[in-house]
Amino acid sequence: MYPPPPAPAPHRDFISVTLSLGESYDNSKSRRRRSCWRKWKQLSRLQRNVILFVLGFLILCGFLYSLQVSDQWKALSGSRAEVEKMKLEVLPVLPAPQKESAEPEGFADILSQKRQRHLRRGPPHLQIRPPNTVSKDGMQDDAKEREAALGKAQQEENTQRTVISWRGAVIEPEQATEPPSKRAEASIKPLFLASRIWKEPAPPNERQKGVIEAFLHAWKGYQKFAWGHDELKPVSKTFSEWFGLGLTLIDALDTMWILGLKQEFKEARKWVSENLDFQKNVDVNLFESTIRILGGLLSAYHLSGDSLFLSKAEDFGNRLMPAFTTPSKIPYSDVNIGTGFAHSPQWTSDSTVAEVTSIQLEFRELSRLTGIKKFQEAVEEVTKHIHSLSGKKDGLVPMFINTNSGLFTHPGVFTLGARADSYYEYLLKQWIQGGKKETQLLEDYVRAIEGIKAHLLRQSQPRKLTFVGELAHGRFSAKMDHLVCFLPGTLALGVHHGLPADHMDLARALMETCYQMNQQMETGLSPEIAHFNMYPRADHKDVEVKPADRHNLLRPETVESLFYLYRVTKDRKYQDWGWEILQSFNKYTRVPSGGYSSINNVQNSHKPEPRDKMESFFVGETLKYLYLLFSDDLELLGLDTCVFNTEAHPLPIWSPA
């Protein structure tokens, strides 16, 4: 018998318990999180690094954008009230110093014409910017920062300032040139008749006739293809707009008068009367529009005596005033002349030092002529502020200044090229304009020249040409912009007005260098930027040009300085050098159908490559200075009678010494 089978094992039940530590089970949410982490871990190291880099870059961009937005909001704090306060005023324009019935010679037929309605031209794609607001706390912080910086600068000046003397003359404590008082506003008259800065010159000589012919050729192209527009594009026979205000026409008004082109002047004057309307929704650059438009109108008024130009100048000056509604009173770079909204560029809240310190001649003169003191007060506040700032190096200034804090930015970089050049020029010219009374201006100018000698002056090899380089955080760069060629002329002007004789030695040396910057090029025209060889090397010239810098924009700085050097020294070699440059312009930049074009390559006489643009300063400055350089009459717009703004527009000296 088989034994009975064993009894089956008893059935066991198992219970699974999940300890969640108080957290409820939510189906699959936690599992999904763990799944994402596992997916991340499954990525390669390269993939994870790329994702992290992109995320970091986006976070950084967001942070920088928030800072920029914060700056813009701070900058516009309280702007509504100030803009309303400075809304375009319609103030009575004081008449020119002449009888109502008197008219400039040869203008009776124009002045009697009725004003006609015109078709308004507006630049394409205008952008309207709404005004912004900002917190008061930001403004208070900026104000405290400015106050601390200015206090430090004042303390430094009190300990370091010395009395400067030249040729035995001691500079007295500053005598400010006061703006017109309120009491005088109703009765003030323009102090200078047209005859004070203008007299009919002798008939033009042969070289001057060459300049007149060049101007008429340029003007033919402008009249035919760009009349009433900003700039001529002579190769394509069309035009380009910047502000849509007839920039070339206004810039050339005084040139036509000086060259004796009265018929062309009449036609341009008619356009100004009938078509120049500033009530348009367009942004203009404060600096460029001041030196070209405001300066051009004031100069045309002084030369012709025609009150139309003064009326237009006052209107335009009023429309520029909102640019000064910043927390620091350092003006914005741009202003909409139709809406009155002023602002910094989109990419920064900085203005350049040259821009904010090279509008003073024009605004001061506008106050003097109209009796409206706000123009002069606004720009002189800027001048005093810059004078008091720390961050300079022996009189040299950085290139940028913040409109919110009023402090220099990008410190340690010093140049006499773009963004700083005309600061130094206007120190001297304001001193001359005001009758040599504002010694603070002269003091800053003389100190700056000493700073140039100490830090920026070098000599090239092998010909030992003296040049002005740049300094960046203690490191010298042998780079010189063509713009720096304004300096020899400014130095010579200072010597003419009594500054040290060694300034003339430097002026002569730099003038030779600027001439060689033209002479050593195959076309005889200077590049935009030159680099100088400082070490003896075989087969190396003193002047070297990089491919990106070898263009020529028809700039005036070299011939401007030739004009001053000839006026002061009477050395005819400077006239000869100017004649060579004019011939080079005719040979390599002249367009047969009319006009002159900037070129891409000054080192290729066979293919200079026209850029198809004639800047307004070619007819406003370059040809004007050449005409005056060739004049046999040294009293034609004499250096004791008028001072030229940085766009070559002559303005009268208030109290000739």
Swiss-Prot record:
Transmembrane segments: 50-70
Name under which the protein is recorded: Endoplasmic reticulum mannosyl-oligosaccharide 1,2-alpha-mannosidase
A biological process term (GO) from this entry: mannoprotein catabolic process
Organismal lineage: Eukaryota, Metazoa, Chordata, Craniata, Vertebrata
GO CC field: cytoplasmic vesicle; endoplasmic reticulum; endoplasmic reticulum membrane; endoplasmic reticulum quality control compartment; membrane
Active-site residues, as the UniProt record annotates them: E288, D421, E528, E557
Domain of life of the source: Eukaryota
Chief location: endoplasmic reticulum
Record membrane topology: Single-pass type II membrane protein
InterPro entries registered for this protein in UniProt: 6hp_glycosidase-like_sf, Glyco_hydro_47, Glycosyl_Hydrolase_47, Seven-hairpin_glycosidases
Organism: Rattus norvegicus (Rat)
PANTHER family: ENDOPLASMIC RETICULUM MANNOSYL-OLIGOSACCHARIDE 1,2-ALPHA-MANNOSIDASE (PTHR11742:SF55), MANNOSYL-OLIGOSACCHARIDE ALPHA-1,2-MANNOSIDASE-RELATED (PTHR11742)
